[in-house]
Structure formats: C-alpha cells, structure tokens
Amino acid sequence: DIVSPPVCGNYFVEVGEECDCGRPGKCQNPCCNATTCKLTPGSQCADGLCCDQCRFKGAGTECRAARSECDIAESCTGQSPECPTDDFQRNGQPCLNNQGYCYNGNCPILDHQCHNLFGAGATVAPDACFNFNRRGQGIYYCRKQNGVTIPCARKDIKCGRLFCVQ
C-alpha cells in the first residue's frame, strides 16, 4: 500500500479534510473552501445524498427509494450528509403474492430461476423433490457452518438446492 499525506484539491476527502471540491478556481461548491478543504462558515455539509444547499436534509427525507418489495427505502437522519446503508426486508419474507421469498433485496421466483438456468421449457419441480434438502448431505443443504452442511428445516426446504423439471 502507498501511504501519502492528505492533499487538498484532489477531490478526495482525506484525514483532516471536511470537504474537497478541487483546486481553488476550479471548485464550484459554495459549501467548501477550496483553499483549506474545510466547510464554509455556516455550512453543515458539502456533498452527499442528504446534503442540500450546505445543510443536512431533514430527518425522514427519502434518499434512496425501494427498488422492489424486498428492498426498504432509506431516509436521511438529519444528522449526516450520507444516506444510511442500503437495507432490505429480512431474507425469507414472502414476496410477489407468495411466489417467491426475499433474498438480499430481491424476490427470486423459482420458476424464473429454472427458466433462466435450463431454458424456456423448464419449471420448478414438485414440492416432494425439495425434501432432499432436509438431508444436509452432499449438495442437499440450506447452509454451511464451519465447513459442515446444515440441513434445511421443513419450512425452508426451498431455500436449499433448486429442483427443476423440463
């Protein structure tokens, strides 16, 4: 790794800087002093999804819309210029009229997964096929913990290996 001291005017906010809008004469941000890389008097912020005209946006102001029913819209805190970390509905939450289950902000539907993997004629296999995932052996499991496969609980059998038929 290369270690170098902070450089005011390089557009990167580094240790000791509150903002960095480029070199004096190039800076177009009224919230940032380009010579010192400090906020201008009265400014709370210079950049960020929750910064507007040098002030923090109010608490509850949406800064990132939900992309799907498995995503959660994020709102400004009123204390920071940054939008909070992207958050999702809990994994396993039913979605799309119980056709799928939320997973990391998406709603994968088993039929769509089969179609994408095996072509237009592929569909999800009968429920009985998914009972293999309760074994916790070989390729049939829900998760691994310390290298050991963990079988799926009855309610989670469709969270393990995907079974499709042509």
Curated annotation (Swiss-Prot):
Motif residue range(s): D/ECD-tripeptide: 69-71
Compartment list: Secreted
Any one Gene Ontology BP term: proteolysis
S-S bonds: 8-37, 19-32, 21-27, 31-54, 45-51, 50-76, 63-83, 70-102, 95-107, 114-164, 142-152
E.C. no: 3.4.24.-
Cofactor note text: Binds 1 zinc ion per subunit.
Cofactor(s) of this protein: Zn(2+)
Domain of life of the organism encoding this protein: Eukaryota
Protein name: Zinc metalloproteinase-disintegrin-like bothrojarin-1
Source organism (scientific name): Bothrops jararaca
